[in-house]
Amino acid sequence: MPLRRFSPGLKAQFAFGMVFLFVQPDASAADISAQQIGGVIIPQAFSQALQDGMSVPLYIHLAGSQGRQDDQRIGSAFIWLDDGQLRIRKIQLEESEDNASVSEQTRQQLMTLANAPFNEALTIPLTDNAQLDLSLRQLLLQLVVKREALGTVLRSRSEDIGQSSVNTLSSNLSYNFGVYNNQLRNGGSNTSSYLSLNNVTALREHHVVLDGSLYGIGSGQQDSELYKAMYERDFAGHRFAGGMLDTWNLQSLGPMTAISAGKIYGLSWGNQASSTIFDSSQSATPVIAFLPAAGEVHLTRDGRLLSVQNFTMGNHEVDTRGLPYGIYDVEVEVIVNGRVISKRTQRVNKLFSRGRGVGAPLAWQIWGGSFHMDRWSENGKKTRPAKESWLAGASTSGSLSTFSWAATGYGYDNQAVGETRLTLPLGVAINVNLQNMLASDSSWSNIASISATLPGGFSSLWVNQEKTRIGNQLRRSDADNRAIGGTLNLNSLWSKLGTFSISYNDDRRYNSHYYTADYYQSVYSGTFGSLGLRAGIQRYNNGDSSANTGKYIALDLSLPLGNWFSAGMTHQNGYTMANLSARKQFDEGTIRTVGANLSRAISGDTGDDKTLSGGAYAQFDARYASGTLNVNSAADGYINTNLTANGSVGWQGKNIAASGRTDGNAGVIFDTGLENDGQISAKINGRIFPLNGKRNYLPLSPYGRYEVELQNSKNSLDSYDIVSGRKSHLTLYPGNVAVIEPEVKQMVTVSGRIRAEDGTLLANARINNHIGRTRTDENGEFVMDVDKKYPTIDFRYSGNKTCEVALELNQARGAVWVGDVVCSGLSSWAAVTQTGEENES
């Protein structure tokens, strides 16, 4: 039958008719026009409503539970009366992270119900472990399940960030500027400079990236280079890109070590997308807890409580993001109403992996286009000219438990290349990495590394080896090297000992050897600071040349308030030098760090080197740029000076602002309208950022969700009332620049004494300003908050007459005493007749 709306009139009749519902029919009920369903007398009005059809809530109820306090709503059902038979037309399930879940079999039974009739007990059996029970008295439907019919509420391992919050054209420009000057020993000098620019312009999720640099600015050898000009759309788990980029910026799921330097003009498509966030911090093996009612789950390891979490009734996966990494057992304890219901041991499997996380789908990417290969040379022996070629390939990656892998197959210049990368943690102690390459010109490469933490937790060891043989086509060099190293933490054996590290590198192709040994020990750590001892030795052999050995020993002193000093000696190039270093850090201001170092030869033959050398540096963080200025006089007599600065500019419509930060290529412009050096703070995902003056730009990482809250700054005397725009929720893609324009009132707490023009005090008078009112005391004194944009106080008397006080608050901050002020327009307070509300505005 066609579905009809339950009209307001019928709702009223139904509400009235419910009063006459009875469990047992009696004689009087039989006389009226009524119907009995499931032992319940249905009045005529309610029967008509049921024939029209109505929606009732659907709750899940655990069999054997007393009462309905732990029932959870999981959807709704549409019921109707058909020729005296009560039926379910359909069921609509409502998904919720907090709700219990039903098994897939039970879910399918619910979704396929169509015109299913209730039996005389108002029940519809679904499976051996689940049935539907209808209560006409409460007008609700219960899904009564045994534990076997419950599903498990698993935690999502991935999530799409959704649509962009910025629906207009916007842009982010990042800049990096550097100037270098070398003053030679003979008086000559040379200067070089560069300016790198990265611009991302976006419309919602679509963006265009331009990346390039200018070199030798202001010199006769000026040059420029464009590294990337590309359109990209990364949305809902898929990424498309097209344009030009150099091979240094090539993005691939798998290794691509056989690609030579050059530029690629092509397209790329795949599901390796930043718009989908994968959570790899959960245990690979889910930790599951069953709760018969709402309660708590306690996780304990070796008697130590790790986590307490609250859940509703059902099977739930416990959140393991905050647990330590490793493979270990935890005791899962379920507590309901203060009583321990169950206790069992489960395994946590959390290991670092390079994949997208457990449960992530297979990642893939296809790409291709035209490849301009740059001229290539190997030590002047082999030379290949620049060349144009085709390029096509595919990449894929995945994981199985803690094992992750990646593979790439591609071709160019009539060569086929295949590469793989494998990562396998062997328990908590050992991690193995393998990377291989094989090409059709008989080129091959193998890179293997193993890292291990030895038993006891006081030492670690790593081994790397690379061997590469190149055929007659690929533009790469042979390689044959190995390295081994380790760290021994002697603190675990005796607290007064330190940490010893050693490494050895052997490049057999160039017949060079290099080893280092370092020792660090904390001598003192307390209220007055910390003192540490460093010592080490390094030795380098290159081919047939004699060995070069260097030694050092130093004491590092760190003091409170950001002070650091170091004193020591080094021996290298046949002579010994004494070294002094100092550094000071600042929490506020433009200059954040200043430092200096000084070295003097104290023994041995310095040859042509100077006996005294040193340098100084400063790190700055200004409104529009941040960077470093460094001046250094080396032992060879050269004086090197360099300046680096970077920052960002954000633009959207009429709004443009700059920042000395380069946190990302998206951001937010705050148009606060604050005068002079006014300051408030922006709290973004828990981090606090200062906002100064009328307009600020804060660059942020793209592909992120941000919760932004404006608040008063703890470092400012000013008080602001943020009337609107206090909180915002943003989703930003590359190039997205959001604009937040809050209504901000700068508040000043003003106190003083108000007089009429003849000097008489306005005692017990109601005075007003732009945002509020107050009453003076018997001495005419008052205290009230005033908006600095409207620095006036007025007093209304004798009907429509008004006097006004103009306050001078330009320099006022926080609270101010203005002393005696005159209300212009009121000749005398004595002449005012106080009658009720006469003096109220």
UniProtKB/Swiss-Prot annotation:
A matching Pfam family: CooC_C
Keyword Transport annotated: yes
Keywords (A to Z) from UniProt: Fimbrium biogenesis, Signal, Transport
Residues making up the signal peptide according to the UniProt record: 1-29
InterPro entries from the UniProt entry: CarboxyPept-like_regulatory, Pilus_assem_C, Pilus_assem_E-set-like_dom
Domain of life according to the entry: Bacteria
Presence of keyword Transport: yes
Induction text: Negatively regulated by H-NS. Positively regulated by IHF and EcpR.
Similarity comment text for this entry: Belongs to the EcpC/MatD family.
Cited function: Part of the ecpRABCDE operon, which encodes the E.coli common pilus (ECP). ECP is found in both commensal and pathogenic strains and plays a dual role in early-stage biofilm development and host cell recognition.
Protein name: Probable outer membrane usher protein EcpC
